[in-house]
Amino acid sequence: MSVLVKEVIEKLRLDIVYGEPELLEKEINTADITRPGLEMTGYFDYYTPERIQLLGMKEWSYLISMPSNSRYEVLKKMFLPETPAVIVARGLVVPEEMLKAARECKIAILTSRAATSRLSGELSSYLDSRLAERTSVHGVLMDIYGMGVLIQGDSGIGKSETGLELVKRGHRLVADDRVDIFAKDEITLWGEPAEILKHLIEIRGVGIIDVMSLYGASAVKDSSQVQLAVYLENYDTHKTFDRLGNNAEELEVSGVAIPRIRIPVKTGRNISVVIEAAAMNYRAKEMGFDATRLFDERLTSLIARNEVQNA
């Protein structure tokens, strides 16, 4: 998986100072970024030319302080064929020697008015998400009250129908049938649709529905953090389901675990409302309000009072 230089330009709204069309088609294969400070002093032992080179005020100031011929020579060493692009932050003026070296070495020179630290963070975050390894899972990913909920279950259980009902209730569809999930960092999962399935949902007996066309742009979302997993399964009288919410399960994807709850599907149950309640209950727990703990405390208090009265 790779990202093209032109995609970075479009995402971060960079300005092109120098860049022939073919240079903007160069591939970026690493999310790491280099700020070439030591390299400008002539130390290239651990130089990583395959990364995007980002110059901020410090690097630019040192470069400008150098004699013109020295500036050109050090830039010639930095600009190698495998270098995707060079970005100059803060809207700083690109020296003529840099343009000359870029033309000779065929390297795109880009600029941004953003502060270096902010630009570095945005660039790293974008490349991390684009280059992260994807894991495809079967299910429906919904944005419910701003929280990403992954709905899974056996084939034919009604995942897509539940997703459509949630859309009608004002929530947003992220992905149906196939959800591509990646770890944005060590504790966060994100999900997005396959490009071919974007904004589409399949309903048995009806066919494929374009959710954006039918319900508007507010009914869809391109990606979402995955915070809760819901597993739908047929109701079985011989199986015990969690009734208090104290039997925690987890779903692990790409080394990151998220909580998962199991919801029994039975005639007459409004599953979309149950999932809404599950999402709100999870958010309440994250904010420190735990209904299960409150029930336990009330039950313990009631038992204690009864013991005193019966003593």
Curated annotation (Swiss-Prot):
Binding residue positions for Mg(2+): S160, E202
GO molecular function: ATP binding; magnesium ion binding; phosphorelay sensor kinase activity; protein serine/threonine kinase activity; protein serine/threonine/tyrosine kinase activity
Lineage: Bacteria, Bacillati, Bacillota, Bacilli, Lactobacillales
Region annotation (Important for the catalytic mechanism of dephosphorylation) ranges: 264-269
Gene symbol of the encoding locus: hprK
Functional note: Catalyzes the ATP- as well as the pyrophosphate-dependent phosphorylation of a specific serine residue in HPr, a phosphocarrier protein of the phosphoenolpyruvate-dependent sugar phosphotransferase system (PTS). HprK/P also catalyzes the pyrophosphate-producing, inorganic phosphate-dependent dephosphorylation (phosphorolysis) of seryl-phosphorylated HPr (P-Ser-HPr).
Other notes: Both phosphorylation and phosphorolysis are carried out by the same active site and suggest a common mechanism for both reactions.
Catalytic activity entry: [HPr protein]-L-serine + ATP = [HPr protein]-O-phospho-L-serine + ADP + H(+); [HPr protein]-O-phospho-L-serine + phosphate + H(+) = [HPr protein]-L-serine + diphosphate
Similarity field: Belongs to the HPrK/P family.
Single GO biological process annotation from the record: regulation of carbohydrate metabolic process
Spans annotated as Important for the catalytic mechanism of both phosphorylation and dephosphorylation: 201-210
Database matches in SUPFAM superfamilies: HprK N-terminal domain-like (SSF75138), PEP carboxykinase-like (SSF53795)
Enzyme category, top tier: transferase
Cofactor(s) in the UniProt record: Mg(2+)
Residues annotated for ATP binding in this entry: G153, D154, S155, G156, I157, G158, K159, S160
Known partners and oligomeric status: Homohexamer.
EC number(s) stated in the UniProt entry for this protein: 2.7.11.-, 2.7.4.-
Active site: H138, K159, D177 (proton acceptor), R243
Protein name per UniProt: HPr kinase/phosphorylase
Superkingdom assignment: Bacteria
Any Pfam family matching the protein: Hpr_kinase_C
Notes concerning its domains: The Walker A ATP-binding motif also binds Pi and PPi.
Annotated keywords: ATP-binding, Carbohydrate metabolism, Kinase, Magnesium, Metal-binding, Multifunctional enzyme, Nucleotide-binding, Serine/threonine-protein kinase, Transferase
